Each structure stands twice: as structure tokens, then as C-alpha cells.
């Protein structure tokens, strides 16, 4: 199986690569369109700022390529947000794979800290990514923007209010949390994606 990780100006690519290696998978980290198109699975990770990153994707043509991939594609954190219609971070139009907008967390109480950082449970899982999961699985989040619960929600969590911990539509899968930083639970998410 050929797994490609999209290389672009976003952090966290190496930690995804290490997580895949722990599962015995040698991924190719690349921006080469032919390699991405011919891969069996594509992972679209990211830590960064939505506006700057979308500008880079558009300048390189990776925006159109990612939208048109037909194999399973897995967006992580910023990768998930960039798969949405629009982001309040940078007020930028995104890939519009998921017809939903990315919103900024607004603290409601003094103890609400932004970014949402740390371990949280996920529930209402509705995707093959979460095969074998219980209702109380802990995963690791680091983000200041979120995707509301919507028709594409594949898992939910709650911080300040309920939001999408994962999305799924056709061949596109995505998590707001970082499976590569979520221990054995995260490894199971990655393995379930690779087994699709």
C-alpha cells in the first residue's frame, strides 16, 4: 500500500510520519501531484494559519488536486478545517469539500481557555475511523477554531459547546484532534483509516 502525506507549509508533518512508522507504514512526504494522485491513501495534516496555508495551496495547485482525489483522504487538525467551506481564521475560502464554515472559539466563562488544548473525550462516533471505539475514548486537541456539529459530523466532543471532532463525506475523512499525538487511541484511528 502506498501512503502519501501532503507536503506544504504546515507543521506537524514529521510527527504524522513517525506515527505511521510505528504502525509499520513507510509514507512518502510529497507535494508531487502525480505521486499524490497515484497513492492508495493520502494524509493531509497540518498545524498553521488557514489564510496563509490556503494561499500556498492555491499558488501550488494543490487545492484543486486535493479536492479531486478519489482515494481515501484523511485531513488532520488544520487539514480538516481547510476541507471546509470558509474559515474565520484569516477570513478565507477553503476547499469546500465539507459544506460548513470554521468558527472561532469565543470563551463564555472565565475558565474557558482558548486554544482548546489537551485531552478530551469523543462520542457519537459514526465512521469507520472509529471502529471498535467505546463512548469514552480520549484524544488530544490543540486548536482555536472549530467546526460546528453538522451533517458531515462523524464524531462529537464538547469544549465551550459541542463541535465536530471528526468529519466524513464520501472518500474524505478528517479529525480535529491529532491522532498522531493521541497514544493507542490515535494509532487505532490511523490504522482504521489505513484499513479502509
Curated annotation (Swiss-Prot):
GO terms for cellular component: cytoplasm. Keywords: Amino-acid biosynthesis, Cytoplasm, Glutamine amidotransferase, Histidine biosynthesis, Hydrolase, Lyase. Pathway: Amino-acid biosynthesis; L-histidine biosynthesis; L-histidine from 5-phospho-alpha-D-ribose 1-diphosphate: step 5/9. InterPro entries: Class_I_gatase-like, GATASE, Imidazole-glycPsynth_HisH. It catalyses: 5-[(5-phospho-1-deoxy-D-ribulos-1-ylimino)methylamino]-1-(5-phospho-beta-D-ribosyl)imidazole-4-carboxamide + L-glutamine = D-erythro-1-(imidazol-4-yl)glycerol 3-phosphate + 5-amino-1-(5-phospho-beta-D-ribosyl)imidazole-4-carboxamide + L-glutamate + H(+); L-glutamine + H2O = L-glutamate + NH4(+). It is found in: Cytoplasm. GO terms for biological process: L-histidine biosynthetic process. One of its GO terms (molecular function) is glutaminase activity. Residues 2-196 form the Glutamine amidotransferase type-1 domain. The active site is at residues 77, 178, 180. Its EC number is 4.3.2.10, 3.5.1.2. The keyword Cytoplasm applies. NCBIfam families: IMP_synth_hisH. IGPS catalyzes the conversion of PRFAR and glutamine to IGP, AICAR and glutamate. The HisH subunit catalyzes the hydrolysis of glutamine to glutamate and ammonia as part of the synthesis of IGP and AICAR. The resulting ammonia molecule is channeled to the active site of HisF. Heterodimer of HisH and HisF. This is Imidazole glycerol phosphate synthase subunit HisH. It comes from Bacteroides thetaiotaomicron (strain ATCC 29148 / DSM 2079 / JCM 5827 / CCUG 10774 / NCTC 10582 / VPI-5482 / E50). The lineage of its organism: Bacteria, Pseudomonadati, Bacteroidota, Bacteroidia, Bacteroidales.
Amino acid at each position: 500500500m502506498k501512503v502519501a502525506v501532503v507536503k506544504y507549509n504546515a507543521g506537524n508533518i514529521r510527527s504524522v510520519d513517525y506515527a505511521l512508522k510505528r504502525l509499520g507504514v513507510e509514507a512518502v512526504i510529497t507535494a508531487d501531484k502525480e505521486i499524490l494522485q497515484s497513492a492508495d491513501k493520502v494524509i493531509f495534516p497540518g498545524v498553521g494559519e488557514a489564510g496563509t496555508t490556503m494561499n500556498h495551496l492555491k499558488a501550488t495547485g494543490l487545492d484543486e488536486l486535493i479536492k479531486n482525489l478519489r482515494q481515501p483522504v484523511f485531513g488532520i487538525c488544520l487539514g480538516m478545517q481547510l476541507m471546509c467551506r470558509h474559515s474565520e481564521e484569516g477570513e478565507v475560502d477553503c476547499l469546500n469539500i465539507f459544506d460548513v464554515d470554521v468558527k472561532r472559539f469565543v470563551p463564555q466563562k472565565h475558565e474557558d481557555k482558548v486554544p482548546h488544548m489537551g485531552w478530551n473525550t469523543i462520542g457519537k462516533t459514526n465512521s469507520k475511523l472509529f471502529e471498535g471505539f467505546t463512548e469514552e475514548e480520549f484524544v488530544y486537541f490543540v486548536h482555536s477554531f472549530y467546526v460546528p456539529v453538522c451533517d458531515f459530523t462523524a464524531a462529537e466532543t464538547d469544549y465551550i459547546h459541542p463541535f465536530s471532532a471528526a468529519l466524513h463525506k464520501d472518500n474524505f475523512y478528517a479529525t480535529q484532534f491529532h491522532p498522531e499525538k493521541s497514544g493507542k487511541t490515535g494509532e487505532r484511528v490511523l490504522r482504521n483509516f489505513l484499513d479502509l
